[in-house]
Amino acid sequence: MGKQVLDSGWLAARSTELELTGVQLTTTRPPSGTSAPWIEAVVPGTVLGTLLKNKLVPDPFYGLNNEGILDIYDSGREYYTFWFFKSFECKLSENQHVSLNFRAINYSAEVYLNGHKEILPKGMFRRHSIDITDILHPDGKNMLAVLVHPPDHPGQIPPEGGQGGDHEIGKDVATQYVEGWDWMAPIRDRNTGIWDEVSLYTSGPVKIADVHLVSSFFDMFRRAYLHSTVELENKSSWRAECSLTILVTTELDGDFNLIEYHQTHELSIPPESVIQYTLPPLFFYKPNLWWPNGMGKQSLYNVEITIAVKGFGDSDSWNNKFGFRQIESAIDEATGGRLFKVNGQRVFIRGGNWILSDGLLRLSKKRYMTDIKFHADMNFNMIRCWGGGLAERPEFYHYCDIYGLLVWQEFWITGDCDGRGIPVSNPNGPLDHALFLHCARDTIKLLRNHASLALWVGGNEQIPPEDINSALKNDLKLHPFFKHNGVTVIGEDMLSETEDPSQYLDGTRVYIQGSMWEGFANGKGDFTDGPYEIQNPEDFFKDDFYSYGFNPEVGSVGVPVAATIRATMPPEGWQIPLFKRLSDGFIEEVPNPIWEYHKYISYSKPGKVHDQIVLYGQPTNLDDFCEKAQLVNYVQYRALLEGWTSRMWTKYTGVLIWKTQNPWTGLRGQFYDHLHDQTAGFYGCRCAAEPVHVQLNLATYFIEVVNTTHEELSDVAIEVSVWDLDGTCPYYKVIENVLVSPKKVLPITELKYQGSKNAKPVYFVLLKLFRPSNTTILSRNFYWLRLPGTDFKLLEPYRAIEAPLKLTSEVNIVGSAYKIQMRVQNLSKNLNSESVNFLANDEKSDLSKKEGYISRICSGFKNSGTDSLRVVETKGTGSGVAFFLHFSVHAVKKDENEIEDLRILPVHYSDNYFSLVPGETTNISISFEVPHGVTPRVSLRGWNCSEEHYSVL
């Protein structure tokens, strides 16, 4: 009883190279191995992924390789129509039943098993289940062949590219990004393949399917009920007398499970029938609630439902993680933006747009875990699954449940491909509306039990055709328990008189018809999202930057580190852009053809934004360019989020950045690259999106404290220090007795250093929010700033001042997993003297407090005295701020002549791209896994710190 996943041992062959039928393949003429035309197949995966695995095509994401791969429009659909073959063993006992399940195929298929044929209907986002009980061979040895056809309308890629190519893919119920976008090259096979899980499922005479779990709350979330409806299919020819048991447990520390509920109900199911059975609601008093990232724990219960049949025993079981939580959404009266509440608490949305993890649909659990943890590490609380991408997989949602990411899931409509593109096409959406609705309803059943799923949206920058939109509104209408704005409209005493909410398809989440409607952008569907290019950092704080309460898309630059450029492009792609100075003084960047193909966008906007990279000096080579790009990435995205947060609840209810990552080796709009290395923008977001945060408003130069939590922030103080390039501190102030109400932004005081007569053209500002009672730092924020009309070119000679650093590490190794606690100290001496000129006399009195505060705040790391401690001091002899330090992890070279990319990825850092003032210490946690036989080393580099290699063994 249970599931057997078929994810290995598959073979594939192009249909035009094989003259055998499916009946022959699964009876008398099966393939004997990887002799032509058969090759090893990638399942789950795509045809292009299979061809790449067998080196029959070059890596489409490397350089310009994609241009050398035949496009489906030019080759014809038959070229990417493939057979997939697998033999498997499955032997049944009496009264057992088995189904063959495909969780998704793109786009249609013919299935042959032991000579029997089954035609699978079209649609990329639907499950297929075939009862194969009577088809299996008695000896348990079986042969399976699947002929997979591409989408019916794969479309043509115009020479100039475009948003969704010629839009033909919009006629099918399929992912649309595959025709290419302004951030994506086209996918040549249009993601044809068995792209999701294939499995065998064995049960007894009665099978469980499509369980629906819902929680309802009363009495300010102290009283809760778990509602559940189960679909039960009796596959036997006799009436089944059954016992249905539900078991609810919660995990305690030490891998112990606490049983919360264990109930059994008796029922009878007619022969060869399917019934819906609703269990009585289970009552919970003060259950552990599931909260979004940054608001509390992601408490999850385990729900197991088992069906036993009289005379047979256990027939089937189902289990799933479940989070008690309630999501509300309405248009906020104060801002006009869409407002979300979880468990009665307002959530200020800071998150990002998501396309999909990989353009060849290599969607492993490990990759999903890294992707979602990265979003949580950035302190984000929402991911928007864009309508031109996927209905994301259960594994994606599992990790969103674990890490607390709310998910906005769109259906497969985009303005570009469905009525608003240039040229206009498919104004009535996909050709088969019934198919679209079938896929939508099946997707809802697949995903609805996930606590992280927050809302359904009809499409991207477009609404579905009227009949589809009306059907979705009806299918997703809210149950009366959830039609409220903070107050439950039905009392607990009405539970027995109201239709159980688990009987709805999904009545717990709002349905919004499109991404720019009903509280998003201007709410009317006009193109009022964006912008998507480089900005002056201070502009994000200005009142006229964005006019509406919730921006679903605002984006900018995203060049990765130089090592990624070298790993994903040939040497001719390592040439940095040409910087062409225009007559008005602005700079136009001209990228090389490979960068242009990989959708690079400029770090300048002639006429509005001066080149943000050249502000640091003309880059000389790829390493210099990418290092300066990281400076800009950090500043750009920190300013974006801090600008939005500065007007939390007064003007804005949320923002989603376009976009957090790329499904290929693109060069725009990303916080980590396709290889899973973070940009500095990642850590700019992590800083800005802290639940409790201190920040500098770059438009007003007021220091602000942000409290997004539902608790008052009291007994806190702010330390403000300004540092010159020579390591002196001309400005220091401590502001005590700060109190910030829940969910408020409080301006504290204006930073006036930049207006003083002795202000330096380039200077550093360090803000610390801390508790004086125990010197716990709640938020730390480091800025590098310039006076108006100047640039950052004074930082260029600063590189020659080698900052002296001390690194202390403690290493923990379990199998292939490494966890390193790294303490980094700037050994520079504090050069302050009593002759330092302050702006006002009242600030001079704070000087005597400075050393005490700094030494206490920076003393958090204690030497444990264990053998795993290592200490290294760099050779720097200069003095001043250790600027823009960043760790990386590499494999130790086995040969000094090795030049390939030796980075170990992914790596999770508690912080990176950080700076330390003289005498300051910080602690960084680093975790990663190493491949077998690889010895890792940690590298620390910085603007004024040359690379140091640090072996962890």
Swiss-Prot record:
Expressing tissues: Ubiquitously expressed.
Top-level EC class: hydrolase
GO molecular function (one): mannosylglycoprotein endo-beta-mannosidase activity
GO-annotated biological processes: carbohydrate metabolic process
Catalyzed reactions: Hydrolysis of the alpha-D-mannosyl-(1->6)-beta-D-mannosyl-(1->4)-N-acetyl-beta-D-glucosaminyl-(1->4)-N-acetyl-beta-D-glucosaminyl sequence of glycoprotein to alpha-D-mannosyl-(1->6)-D-mannose and N-acetyl-beta-D-glucosaminyl-(1->4)-N-acetyl-beta-D-glucosaminyl sequences
Residues at the active site: E461 (proton donor), E553 (nucleophile)
PTM notes: The mature enzyme is proteotically cleaved into 3 subunits of 31 kDa, 28 kDa and 42 kDa.
Record's keyword annotation contains Zinc: no
SUPFAM superfamilies (UniProt xref): (Trans)glycosidases (SSF51445), beta-Galactosidase/glucuronidase domain (SSF49303), Galactose-binding domain-like (SSF49785)
Keywords: Glycosidase, Hydrolase
The enzyme's E.C. designation: 3.2.1.152
Domain of life per record: Eukaryota
Keyword Lyase: no
Biological role stated in the UniProt entry: Glycosidase that specifically hydrolyzes the Man-beta-1,4-GlcNAc linkage in the trimannosyl core structure of N-glycans. Does not hydrolyzes pyridylamino derivatives sugar chains containing Man-alpha-1,3-Man-beta or Xylose-beta-1,2-Man-beta.
Self-association and partners: Heterotrimer of 31 kDa, 28 kDa and 42 kDa subunits.
Family, similarity comment: Belongs to the glycosyl hydrolase 2 family.
Protein name: Mannosylglycoprotein endo-beta-mannosidase
